[in-house]
A protein has these predicted regions:
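Short, Lys/Arg-enriched N-terminal segments with co-localized hydrophobic residues
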Residues: 78-94
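Short glycine-rich, Thr/Ser-proximal phosphate-binding strand/loop in the N-terminal lobe
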Residues: 97-136
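Short beta-strand-loop/turn "lid" adjacent to the catalytic site in phosphate-handling enzymes
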Residues: 149-197, 215-217, 223-235
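Glycine-rich phosphate-binding loop of actin/hexokinase-like ATP-binding domains
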Residues: 227-329
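Phosphate/ATP-binding catalytic cores across multiple sugar-kinase/actin-like superfamilies
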Residues: 260-264, 375-393
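A mobile "lid/hinge" subdomain adjacent to the ATP/sugar-phosphate binding pocket shared
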Residues: 329-373
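Conserved phosphate-binding/catalytic loops in two-lobed NTP-binding clefts
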Residues: 409, 413-457
């Protein structure tokens, strides 16, 4: 029988519970055990008696996972002093999570240590570009990324991978552990997200090939919006067509909307499941979401990310008949029309630039088209905010997030100046400031709190990945 030596320590109920957690066997002098010569403690330390630790089976397991548990147990036992276990340290609880966003031509990544304070969690981030040209495929991209990570990890091992996925449809409404079957199902949803899901699936297969024993989790942008009622997600088209082609409102940016709404609720001292608010995610892609009881009940993007607000290069809402007119009279096909609506419209079409900073500067210099673009964009957002205030039964907060929402006080002012009818009042000095910290910019007497909260989708993905993996 193999006996494991452990350092003589004082044993308490917490120590015994720790051993039971790992399925180990305690042998004290009043239980039968093979004798083991242990160093004698000083007379003052002889009580209580030192137990001896035996493995649960006579023969030691060669299973590396069990060995890991024994080693981890031994380390934690050494931390017991004066009959009590020390508080678990960051070193004991660290979880290194790789967050990836695999696109068709790029691989964005970030490594986070979720045991550290939020400001210190991000260890590194980067981008591998030109996949399909200079970089042959996603497997090579993951190899390049892995080489870059080696000096950062410094011998530590990743413990999980979290993958961002744009479209989960009705199939995936929660973080999901990846298997070959799950990856294929994500790939099968490509008709709903042809620019994203095929690349996500390729990235997942490459990651699973590189780290076959590492838990990998998919986090879906659409999942947060799966709680929308049917009156919000169904389109008024024949049921057979809607069902045949899965045509409905899905919504996007869900990871950001959920994360920011949670931060807002915490800031205001409101239980997350009681929070009613409106989140405006304003970047090159933009969407606004109505949150009621902590859940998404409506959102501006629809079947694709094209619907809703005017964006950097996307048109947002448009009468479908205008599209059939363009198709027939211009003699173009659907693919060309899709390119026009997604890549040649929005601010770019109206003002000649998809960069909000340049559009604001042009408007301030007297450019009438730039001013019109700002007026149209803020007007469209104002309409959604006003409507969603009714949807949630009176918002407790309006939140601005993402690149424009966080950094453009000029655009926030354009929007907020339109919302006086809702009783919204804001502090112009606070609004003009730029800060990486979440903050309230409304006045004390504002009917609705106005917040600016930096989004952190990578943090949200890492936390969701950790939660699922720890439950395995």
């Amino acid at each position: 029988m193999r006996i494991y030596r452990v350092k003589p320590i004082a044993w308490t109920d917490s120590s015994v519970a720790l051993l039971n957690e790992y399925g180990a066997t305690l042998c004290t002098p009043d239980r039968e055990a093979t004798p083991l010569d242990l160093p004698e403690a000083d007379e003052k330390e002889k009580s209580p008696p030192t137990p001896r630790l035996l493995p649960p089976n006579a023969a030691p397991s060669k299973n590396p996972r069990q060995k890991h548990c024994r080693d981890r147990l031994a380390r934690r036992l050494e931390k017991c002093e004066n009959g009590a276990e020390k508080k678990t340290t960051k070193e004991d609880t660290f979880m290194l999570i790789l967050v990836v966003n695999a696109g068709s031509s790029s691989l964005k990544y970030q490594v986070r240590d979720t045991s550290l304070p939020e400001a210190e969690q991000m260890l590194t981030s980067g981008l591998v570009e030109n996949i399909g040209t200079d970089v042959p495929n996603h497997e090579v991209a993951f190899d390049i990324m892995s080489e870059r990570l080696e000096p950062v990890l410094a011998g530590r091992e990743l413990q999980a991978v979290g993958h961002r996925v744009v479209q989960g449809a009705e199939k995936f409404t929660h973080p999901t552990l990846l298997t070959e079957e799950v990856v294929q199902q994500i790939d099968d949803l490509s008709p709903l997200a042809p620019l994203h899901n095929p690349a996500h699936a390729q990235g997942m297969r490459a990651a699973m090939h590189k780290w076959p024993s590492l838990p990998q989790v998919a986090i879906f942008d659409t999942a947060f919006h799966s709680t929308m009622p049917e009156e919000a997600w169904r389109y008024a088209i024949p049921y057979d067509l809607a069902d045949k082609y899965s045509i409905r409102r899905y919504g996007f940016h869900g990871t950001s909307h959920e994360y920011v709404s949670h931060v807002a609720a915490d800031m205001l001292g409101i239980a997350r499941d009681e929070f009613n608010g409106i989140v405006a995610h304003l970047g090159n892609g933009a969407s606004v979401t109505a949150v009621k009881g902590g859940k998404s009940v409506d959102t501006s993007m629809g079947y694709t990310p094209l619907a809703g607000l005017i964006m950097g290069t996307r048109s947002g809402d448009i009468d479908p008949s205008a599209l059939t007119t363009i198709l027939s009279r211009e003699g173009i096909d659907g693919e060309r029309l899709d390119t026009i609506l997604n890549k040649e419209s929005g601010l770019l079409a109206l003002a000649g630039s998809n960069d909000m900073r340049k559009v604001v500067e042009a408007a301030q210099s007297g450019d009438e088209r730039a001013q019109l673009a700002l007026d149209m964009t803020s007007y469209r957002l104002m309409k959604y905010i006003g409507g969603y205030n009714l949807v949630v039964g009176g918002a407790q907060a309006l939140i601005f997030t993402a690149g424009i929402g966080e950094n453009s006080g000029d655009f926030r002012k354009l929007v907020l100046d339109r919302l006086g009818a809702l009783g919204i009042k804001y502090n112009e000095e606070e609004n003009a400031k730029r800060s990486p910290e979440p903050r309230v910019i409304s006045t004390e007497d504002s009917a609705i709190k106005v917040l600016v909260i930096p989004t952190n989708e990578e943090k949200a993905i890492a936390e969701a990945t950790e939660e699922l993996v720890k439950g395995l």
